[in-house]
Design a protein with these regions (language model features):
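Non-catalytic, well-ordered alpha-helical segments in soluble enzyme domains
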Residues: 22-23, 85-92, 260, 271, ...
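Residue-level recognition of tetratricopeptide repeat
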Residues: 419, 454, 488-489, 523, ...
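Short, structured active-site-proximal loop/turn typified by the sulfatase FGly-forming signature C/S-X-P-X-R
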Residues: 7-47, 51-54, 95-99
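TPR alpha-solenoid repeat register
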Residues: 422, 457, 491-492, 526, ...
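Histidine-centered active-site microenvironments of extracellular/periplasmic hydrolases
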Residues: 276-314, 364-365
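His/Asp/Glu-rich, glycine-adjacent segments
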Residues: 52-239
Length: 603
């Protein structure tokens, strides 16, 4: 279940929203699941399924380059360079079932059944379904289930949102995409219910030894509605909180009902139920105010490294304290439960603490394993690939620069080539997880070789240069990345300059701010950051000079408050009063500013 986080689950279990989850915690074994950077779902779920690091399994982005046309298409199992647990279990004679796992299209031929991620109505609705199932005879049934479960009535949506029925109907009739909360909720519910129905029906029919099911909505509901969920964020309107503030708890109550059904199946069959996420999610005051946009790929800003791991059933160790596990431990744990040795590509170990009778098996060499065979997939047109990319952008998974649907040239050979996003993600993995700046730099440069105007590797090269102490190069790459993204650089420039100041490098901070002010003369935010730097350095007149040109036209209380601060420093009481009165006229909800104004008036 994507994006599960203990903070939210503990709260919903305690308040009675998720009684089945509370039972899981009480009767099973739980752990914090350590993930790794970058916190991007296709990468992490492929590590969970293979036990291999990203630079080994090679699923590194939401997209790949078609080896025949050079077009960007949705990431597929063709990018995966190693076998998954279902291949290993199938080859060992176990019956397996897979439903909806990230990057698994076309469906793989296994000893059992296989439904690829293209059966999900969230990202793949309206795209070719051919090749989504093994045996292929399952495909007509998949289409029927998706159509039936995907038909979410307006009255059903009304159970989740506090929106008048007429507005729900109007939102759905406009043809809006996932950027519309009502439409997004309908697709999240459709995907959740279709995935669950397909998995449950096939499990009941086939009773495999291993069933691997991926639920996407537990993450998507956060990306769409977490900003409207209490406690209220400064960037969230009260109207949105009133309309959508209960969506998350109501959706997780639905998830709890589905979990209860799997618990009953596990009890009936004496099976072990494992539930894990790929990463956690920010649900408290640490939630970012950045929303999905065409400039920033913001989805990963909401993720945090600590996810969720739960085991439940006869073999689970009951009521043990919450432990610690790694995402790399998932695959060897599952293989050990099936009495199959882990593979040498797996750096993790079986989570023995979570089970009463589990023992880690010796690593196996599998040199002559049969290759993965996949069914024939229906080709995807450039238009269809573009629609997929637009959905990813609406959810904050891709920036606008990454939605271009063609690469400079077709890939060599039969395997898909890596996109600029894949190289950038690999660089982040090398820099932040492996701690190998040389390989990280090489990956970022490969990303720029494909897309010279791609802002993210520029920014990441700036981070590398800053870590190396090369402030001039850090400034160069940072300003290049800000120019490429074509948005107000003030918040980022300010954060970097304050960090330079905090580390005692005021010269680097001033250089960055002055160059930024020249590059962005119309940016009030940059001017405000430069003025605050001058103020911190004790030069109130330079601070005033850097920002005063924006005073006549500004509608930003922060600018007026900063100017009042400088005027206070210069003992210009009348100016202070005028500026603070104007600031409070724009935003009366500033109690500290109101107190400052009162003190100035009473002197």
């Amino acid at each position: 279940m994507d994006g599960l986080d203990w903070d939210l689950l503990d709260r919903l279990a305690a308040d009675g929203t998720m009684p089945n989850w509370k039972r899981l915690e009480t009767e099973g074994a739980t752990a914090r699941l350590r993930s790794f950077a970058p916190l991007i779902s296709p990468i992490l779920w492929t590590t969970a399924a293979t036990g291999a690091p990203p630079d080994v399994h090679r699923v590194l982005d939401f997209q790949e380059v078609d080896p025949k046309t050079g077009a960007k298409v949705p990431i597929s199992g063709l990018s995966r360079a190693v076998q998954a647990i279902w291949n290993t279990a199938s080859a060992a004679g176990r019956k397996v079932g897979v439903v909806g796992w990230w990057a698994t299209h076309p469906a793989e031929e296994v000893n059992g059944f296989f439904v690829s991620d293209h059966a999900s109505p969230i990202l793949f609705e309206g795209l070719p379904l051919g090749g989504a199932a093994y045996p292929p005879a399952l495909e007509p049934g998949l289409a029927q289930v998706s159509a039936r479960e995907g038909a979410i009535p307006d009255a059903e949506l009304a159970r989740f949102v506090d929106v008048p029925p007429g507005e729900i109907a109007a939102a759905r009739s406009t043809g809006a995409g996932l950027e519309n909360p009502i439409v997004a909720l309908s697709r999240i519910l459709a995907s959740t219910r279709a995935t669950h129905r397909i998995a449950r029906d096939l499990y009941d029919r086939e009773r495999p030894n291993l069933l691997a099911v991926y639920y996407e909505g537990t993450d998507e509901v956060g990306h769409v509605f977490a900003s409207s969920t209490p406690p209220r964020l400064a960037c969230a309107s009260q109207a949105d909180v009133d309309r959508y503030g209960k969506v998350v708890s109501r959706y997780y109550a639905e998830i709890d009902r589905l979990i209860g059904q799997w618990m009953r199946r596990a009890e009936e069959d004496g099976a072990t139920l494992l539930i894990h996420s790929d990463h956690g999610f920010k649900w408290g005051a640490d939630r970012p105010c950045a929303l999905a946009s065409g400039n920033w790929a913001t989805a990963a800003f909401w993720h945090r490294p600590d996810g969720v791991f739960v085991s439940w059933g006869k073999r689970a160790r009951r009521g043990s304290p919450r432990g610690d596990a790694s995402l790399f431990d998932v695959a060897p744990t599952i293989l050990s439960l099936l009495d199959i040795p882990p593979d040498r590509v797996m750096p993790g170990t079986a989570a023995e603490f979570a089970f009463a009778d589990l023992r880690a098996l010796p690593v196996a060499e599998r040199a002559n394993r049969p290759p993965v065979t996949r069914v024939q997939a229906e080709p995807m047109s450039t238009k269809e690939a573009s629609e997929y990319a637009k959905k990813l952008m609406a959810l904050g998974y891709l920036s606008r620069s990454e939605t271009r649907t063609s690469a400079p040239a077709p890939a060599a050979g039969d395997r898909p080539a890596m996109t600029e996003g894949a190289w950038n993600n690999l660089g982040v993995y090398y820099r932040d997880t492996v701690k190998d700046p040389a390989r990280a730099r090489d990956a970022f440069e490969k990303a720029l070789a494909i897309a010279p105007d791609y802002y993210s590797p520029m920014f990441n090269l700036a981070v590398l240069a800053r870590a190396d102490g090369d402030m001039k190069m850090a400034e160069l790459w940072l300003l290049r990345s800000m120019a490429a993204i074509r948005t107000d650089p003030g918040p980022v420039i300010g954060a970097w300059s304050r960090e330079f100041d905090a580390k005692g490098n005021a010269g680097a901070a001033l250089s960055l701010l002055e160059h930024s002010a020249r590059a962005y003369p119309d940016s009030e935010a940059v001017a405000r950051e430069l003025s605050m730097h001058h103020y911190r350095m004790g030069d109130c007149r330079a601070a005033l000079a850097a920002l005063s040109r924006f005073e006549p036209t500004t509608k930003e209380p922060r600018t007026l408050n900063a100017l009042a601060l400088f005027a206070t420093c210069l003992r210009e009481r009348t100016t202070v009063i005028r500026l603070l009165e104007r600031s409070l006229t724009i935003n009366p909800n500033q109690p500290e500013i109101a107190r400052t104004l009162a003190r100035a008036q009473n002197r």
